[in-house]
A protein has these predicted regions:
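N-terminal segment immediately downstream of the Sec signal-peptide cleavage site
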Residues: 7-49
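Surface-exposed beta-strand edges and flanking loops
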Residues: 14, 103, 138-140
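Glycine-rich, aromatic-bearing surface loops/beta-hairpins
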Residues: 127-176
Length: 176
């Protein structure tokens, strides 16, 4: 099974999918930034397989994603939906593979939930690997106020990102 997990309020509606099965899914925004703030945008990023951190049994390894996923590349695609955010697009790598998506222009109140649809492709575990399951951790930012990294605060954005030593998993910003 391929899966994603985050210990937070923003998550995937379907956190676990069966190997070889394509599925419709949603990034679920569980709340806004509080204090009357509205979520105006979201950015979601999938592992790109280029500089992704790969762990085996919780220990970082020099293996690459393709050592464990036979059909890596372009497994996810944004599903067009303007019901909450009127502007959206996919993020692509130089080869045109979808590595994430963004939405903006919304005004999701703190007491609402929002669903951002995408299609999760049918990942296939590399038969030559020892893997019996693969977990993909995604990075999600719910944005309430546009700011630079120095201005990051809970009242401006909510981050649910893997803690990999980047500027986006800093203290108090929910790196997991």
């Amino acid at each position: 099974a391929a899966s994603q997990s985050a210990f937070s309020h923003t998550r995937l509606e379907v956190p676990v999918v069966v190997e070889g099965v394509r599925a419709s899914n949603n990034v679920v925004i569980g709340h806004s930034c509080g204090d009357g703030a509205t979520t105006i945008a979201n950015s979601t990023v999938f592992p790109d397989g280029v500089d992704s951190t790969v762990k085996v049994d919780g220990v970082q390894t020099t293996n690459v994603v393709t050592d464990f996923v036979a059909n890596w590349g372009n497994l996810n695609q944004k599903v067009l939906d303007h019901s909450v955010f009127p502007f959206e697009d996919e993020k692509n790598d130089p080869d045109g593979n979808v590595v994430g998506f963004w939405v903006k222009g919304g005004k999701m109140p703190n007491h609402y939930n929002a669903y951002i649809p995408f299609r999760a492709g049918a990942a296939i575990i590399e038969p030559e690997s020892c893997a019996t399951s693969v977990k993909f951790n995604i990075a999600v930012a719910d944005i309430c106020k546009i700011t630079n990294i120095a201005g990051f605060a809970d009242s401006k954005l909510n981050l649910w990102t893997p803690a990999v030593g980047s500027n986006y998993d800093g203290p108090g910003l929910y790196g997991y």
